[in-house]
């Protein structure tokens, strides 16, 4: 039956995807009706698994995995726990065993796994999720680049499912439960993911040889994007009304404001210096450096319960400015700074001034502060000089943003100089 079903669906897929000059409107409508009826199938898990095993048509594989997703959401409460676990295990092993399957098919199956894990975490408190993440960590640590990329895809899908509460509606849960499981995820496995992503980047940074080959560049980019997602996470510590949560989650550049449980992780002394060093190593790769700069911008905005004492704020600021001045010094030796990197650095400065006002800034070591301020003056003058040179509209807009970032808080700098620094 599975062979017959696969043949019928594959024929319909060829018609649906066929060019208009070879497929009549009637043929296309008939083929589309086959998939419409297919999507209505009840308890289709065995049939879909057989299709995944036998069909070589990507469109059929995509539809089969989509049907699993829709059926799971619809029938979750009727399914025995052991059947759910067996299906999740099967899907995970399927994507691991078929690393060469089409990207859009893989992403759909990975999304189904993430939805299952999130839905299960409502009932088991995240136990199954922790098992999945542990298994995925082994993939990333395996040294096999295909398995590492697969592991990154699964982690990314999990994070996407937990990242928002208001917009998450495709797992059959009310938004209040989305909020509950998101908080549960933040306090446990999100920390595990961040620690592991940084650890993997540290290990891989020693293997960086420029120019990067495509596989290494892709893997590094996915790992940095995982770290970036954590550092850009919308941490909401109280159960606010849905409309207010929507406002927070719509913020495109939220500050980094985690709970006190993140103190040990984010204030680890080597974290900030490592990310600055890693950015310096990969700055020639625009596909990665964009994300490393985003990580650094977010760390510049660190505030809240993690820095609940003045000495902690001062220590973090000192560590950050020391690493920043070293980066600027290294860049100055090259006598070249790409526009997007310049914009990133100016955004970092703007965030530092915004979250660490003069009454904090003046307390860092005098020599370091003097060096930092001199570099800011030099950068501002350099950007202004560059703005006088002819360039493209994009370059001119970048320069305008860079100068605006550096001059936006000029009153704060004036106060620092008045205080005698």
Give the location of each predicted region:
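Hydrophobic residues within the alpha-helices of tandem HEAT/HEAT-like
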Residues: 16, 35-39, 67-75, 112-120, ...
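Proline/serine/threonine/glycine-rich intrinsically disordered regulatory regions
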Residues: 1-24, 178-182, 254, 398-402, ...
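Residue-level detector of extended alpha-helical repeat arrays and alpha-solenoid scaffolds
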Residues: 27-28, 61, 65, 102, ...
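Amphipathic alpha-helical segments within extended alpha-helical solenoids and repeat-rich scaffolds
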Residues: 2-8, 39-46, 81-100, 125-146, ...
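Eukaryotic helix-linker segments that join adjacent hydrophobic helices
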Residues: 57-101, 107, 111
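N-terminal "cap/leader" segments of large eukaryotic alpha-helical scaffolds
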Residues: 1-53
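Short inter-helical turns and helix N-cap capping residues of alpha-solenoid HEAT/ARM repeat scaffolds
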Residues: 20-24, 56-57, 99-102, 143-144, ...
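Hydrophobic or amphipathic alpha-helical targeting/insertion segments
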Residues: 93, 101-123, 147-154
């Amino acid at each position: 039956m599975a062979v017959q079903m696969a043949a019928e669906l594959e024929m319909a897929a060829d018609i649906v995807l066929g060019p208009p000059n070879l497929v009549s409107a009637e043929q296309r409508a008939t083929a589309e009706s086959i998939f419409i009826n297919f999507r209505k199938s009840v308890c289709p898990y065995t049939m879909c698994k057989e299709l995944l095993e036998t069909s070589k048509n990507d469109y059929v594989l995509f539809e089969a995995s989509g049907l699993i997703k829709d059926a799971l959401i619809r029938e979750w409460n009727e399914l025995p726990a052991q059947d759910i676990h067996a299906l999740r295990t099967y899907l995970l092993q399927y994507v691991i065993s078929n690393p060469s399957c089409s990207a859009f098919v893989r992403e759909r199956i990975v999304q189904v796994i993430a939805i299952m894990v999130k839905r299960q975490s409502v009932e088991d408190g995240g136990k199954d999720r922790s098992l999945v993440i542990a298994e995925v960590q082994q993939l990333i640590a395996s040294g096999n680049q295909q398995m590492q990329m697969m592991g990154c895809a699964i982690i990314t899908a999990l994070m996407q499912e937990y990242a928002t509460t208001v917009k998450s509606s495709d797992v059959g849960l009310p938004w209040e439960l989305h909020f509950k499981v998101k908080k549960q995820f933040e306090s446990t496995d999100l920390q595990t993911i961040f620690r592991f992503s940084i650890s993997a980047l540290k290990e891989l940074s020693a293997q960086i040889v420029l120019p990067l080959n495509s596989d290494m560049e892709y893997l590094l980019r996915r790992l940095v994007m995982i770290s970036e997602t954590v550092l850009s996470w919308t941490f909401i510590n109280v159960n606010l009304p849905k409309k207010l949560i929507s406002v927070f989650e719509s913020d495109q550049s939220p500050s980094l404001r985690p709970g006190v449980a993140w103190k040990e992780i984010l204030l680890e002394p080597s974290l900030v210096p490592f990310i600055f060093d890693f950015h310096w190593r990969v700055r020639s790769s625009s596909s990665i450096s964009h994300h490393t700069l985003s990580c650094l911008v977010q760390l510049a905005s660190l505030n809240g319960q993690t820095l609940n004492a003045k000495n902690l704020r001062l220590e973090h600021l000192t560590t950050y400015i020391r690493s920043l001045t070293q980066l600027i010094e290294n860049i100055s030796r090259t006598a070249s700074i790409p526009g997007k990197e310049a914009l990133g650095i100016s955004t970092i400065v703007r965030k530092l001034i915004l979250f660490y006002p003069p009454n904090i800034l003046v307390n860092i070591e005098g020599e370091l502060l003097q060096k930092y301020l001199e570099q800011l003056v030099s950068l501002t003058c350099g950007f202004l000089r560059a703005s006088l040179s002819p360039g493209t509209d994009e370059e001119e807009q970048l320069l305008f943003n860079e100068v605006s970032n550096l001059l936006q808080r000029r009153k704060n700098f004036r106060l620092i100089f008045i205080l005698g620094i």
